[in-house]
């Protein structure tokens, strides 16, 4: 299925489908007129004698140098080749696809001045699976994501490297195998392509989409744990959350209540609730903590969908034909959003790890055996799995330090304040990988704890989740080589397989 993009109106759901499902995207035909109009205006300026930044001048600190009209194409090519300075491992294909899509959206507004042929090449690369090799490091998130975007454009001009049919090859070879032709850049086109926040925004969106899946997995794991330790659900009563008023807290409490509603374990200790209202905070305060995390993700989503629809290169062509230099390439909004997402990921993992610790400690687990082990002592059960979760939680705490506060001057002090959005967003991927494992460990431990409550059963919804879990991972009856179990649990959480057996009861990630 091809997703047709209407710049300025692209939705979070469309971008999520591109990220998770690899959907191909293209611009709506209605964008073509504005694109042509912008390109004509740039061609008009390039043919004149007036120096205009980015069209017939040097770049950055060299902006005062006028470039001869005959050298404009060379200028644009040199710009791309000289800026291909990113280093590190290649970004994942789904992130590069998302990045290319975001660049299409930006160009589709008609304010960048590129030719329609260039847009069509980018669309064709997406459609035919020519995926530029883009090293992950090298952007400071101001004056755009220059280095990573330059690697994308390098393939468009027959340089650089690309993946085609999962094989890494030269950019020229990839285009040839896809029956596409490299393009010669004209005035401003190179700058329009590499000036922009699309790499940072793609990474932040990936962190957001993964983080939302982790949050839902954390809510599910938290419900399982609540039943495993015979926790009180009185703190999930909707009215107390309505009295506070935070949207995330309200919808999270509703979700937890639905997940546990018809549990036999829950019914068996209802009469004891008067004595159990003081459960540890990791059980009792789930709506407050996870609700706040959800609200943070929603706020970040609001910023990122605006940025996804934005024009962020420089200079820009206004509707009256005026060309104005500004600073839309500065990715501070993206950097702040990435930092906010990092805080939420850190807290989702923190409260999950505390619930794991609760279940393995027989002094507070309401009758569960030490470390959830049968014949404890001979068997260690979840002893070291809990330590693994603690290690990953601590790692995420360190990565949650805000990246946006760490500006440094660059480019001979011309670009003297930068956002650090790119690595601030990229670290979300590592945090989510840790988080999927933490939640996976909690899910395994909670399922084991619930099985100790037999013959009492958990809720019908949680039974369906446990049934899906046990298709992949057996109950831990005696100690065994656990690493494969943790890996499988990680995959189940990351891919949303456990969530897929449930009805749509989780709050939607939609900007309010």
Curated annotation (Swiss-Prot):
The EC code for this enzyme is 4.3.1.3
After translation, the protein is modified as follows:
Contains an active site 4-methylidene-imidazol-5-one (MIO), which is formed autocatalytically by cyclization and dehydration of residues Ala-Ser-Gly.
A GO molecular function annotation here is:
histidine ammonia-lyase activity
Looking up SUPFAM superfamilies in the UniProt record yields: L-aspartase-like
Instruction: Tell me where on the tree of life, at the top rank, the source sits.
Output: Bacteria
Q: Tell me the GO BP annotations in alphabetical order.
A: L-histidine catabolic process to glutamate and formamide; L-histidine catabolic process to glutamate and formate
Q: Does the keyword Cytoplasm apply?
A: yes
The pathway noted for it is:
Amino-acid degradation; L-histidine degradation into L-glutamate; N-formimidoyl-L-glutamate from L-histidine: step 1/3
Query: Location of the 5-imidazolinone (Ala-Gly) covalent cross-link?
Result: 142-144
Keywords from the UniProt entry: Cytoplasm, Histidine metabolism, Lyase
What Gene Ontology terms describe where this protein resides (cellular component)? cytoplasm
Q: Which Pfam families match?
A: Lyase_aromatic
Q: Which InterPro entries match?
A: Aromatic_Lyase, Fumarase/histidase_N, HutH, L-Aspartase-like, Phe/His_NH3-lyase_AS
Has keyword Cytoplasm?
yes
Residues that the record marks as modified (2,3-didehydroalanine (Ser)) are 143
Matches recorded under Gene3D superfamilies = Fumarase/aspartase (Central domain) (1.20.200.10), Fumarase/aspartase (N-terminal domain) (1.10.275.10)
Its UniProt entry gives the catalysed reaction(s) as:
L-histidine = trans-urocanate + NH4(+)
Compartments where located? Cytoplasm
Please state which protein family the record places this protein in.
Belongs to the PAL/histidase family.
Protein name per the record: Histidine ammonia-lyase
The organism of origin for this protein: Bartonella quintana (strain Toulouse)
Higher taxonomy: Bacteria, Pseudomonadati, Pseudomonadota, Alphaproteobacteria, Hyphomicrobiales
């Amino acid at each position: 299925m091809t997703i047709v993009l209407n710049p300025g109106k692209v939705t979070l759901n469309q971008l999520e489908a591109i990220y998770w499902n690899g959907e191909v995207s293209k611009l709506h035909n209605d964008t073509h007129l504005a694109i042509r109009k912008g390109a004509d205006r740039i061609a008009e300026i390039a043919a004149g004698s007036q120096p205009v930044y980015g069209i017939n001048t040097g770049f950055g600190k060299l902006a005062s140098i006028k470039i001869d009209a005959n050298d404009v194409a060379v200028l644009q090519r040199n710009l791309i080749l000289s800026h291909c300075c990113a280093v590190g491992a290649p970004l994942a294909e789904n992130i590069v696809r998302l990045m290319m899509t975001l660049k299409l959206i930006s160009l589709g507004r008609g304010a960048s001045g590129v030719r329609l042929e260039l847009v069509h090449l980018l669309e064709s690369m997406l459609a035919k699976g020519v995926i530029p090799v883009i090293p992950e490091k090298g952007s400071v998130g101001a004056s755009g994501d220059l280095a990573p975007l330059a690697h994308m454009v390098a393939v468009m001009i027959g340089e650089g490297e690309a993946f085609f049919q999962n094989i890494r090859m030269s950019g020229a070879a990839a285009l040839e195998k896809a029956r596409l032709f490299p393009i010669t850049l004209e005035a401003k086109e190179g700058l329009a392509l590499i000036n922009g926040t699309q790499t940072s925004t793609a990474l932040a969106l990936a962190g957001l989409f993964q983080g939302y899946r982790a949050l839902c997995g954390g809510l599910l794991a938290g419900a399982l744990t609540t039943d495993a330790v015979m926790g009180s659900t009185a703190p999930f009563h909707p009215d107390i959350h309505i009295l506070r008023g935070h949207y995330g807290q309200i919808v999270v409490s509703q979700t937890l209540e639905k997940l546990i509603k018809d549990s036999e374990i829950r019914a068996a200790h209802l009469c004891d609730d008067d004595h159990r209202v003081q459960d540890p905070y990791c059980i009792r305060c789930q709506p407050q903590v996870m609700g706040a995390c959800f609200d943070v993700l929603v706020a970040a989503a609001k910023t990122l969908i605006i940025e996804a629809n934005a024009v962020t290169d420089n200079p820009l062509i206004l509707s009256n034909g005026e060309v104005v230099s500004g600073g839309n390439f500065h990715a501070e909004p993206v950097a702040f959003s990435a930092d906010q997402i990092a805080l939420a990921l850190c807290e989702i993992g923190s409260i999950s790890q505390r619930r794991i610790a609760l279940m393995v400690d027989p002094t507070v687990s309401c009758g569960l055996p030490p470390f959830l082990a049968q014949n404890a002592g001979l068997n260690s059960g979840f002893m070291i799995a809990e330590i693994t979760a603690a290690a990953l939680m601590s790692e995420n705490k360190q990565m949650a330090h805000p990246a946006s506060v760490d500006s440094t001057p660059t480019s001979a002090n011309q670009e003297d304040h930068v956002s650090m959005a790119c690595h601030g967003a990229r670290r979300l991927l590592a945090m989510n990988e840790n988080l999927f494992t933490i939640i996976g460990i909690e899910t395994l431990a909670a399922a084991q704890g619930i099985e100790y409550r037999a013959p009492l059963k958990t809720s019908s919804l949680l039974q369906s989740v446990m049934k899906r879990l046990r298709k992949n991972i057996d109950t831990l009856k005696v100690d065994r080589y656990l690493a494969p179990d943790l890996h499988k649990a990680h995959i189940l959480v990351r891919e949303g397989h456990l969530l897929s057996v449930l009805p749509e009861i989780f709050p939607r990630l939609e900007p309010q």
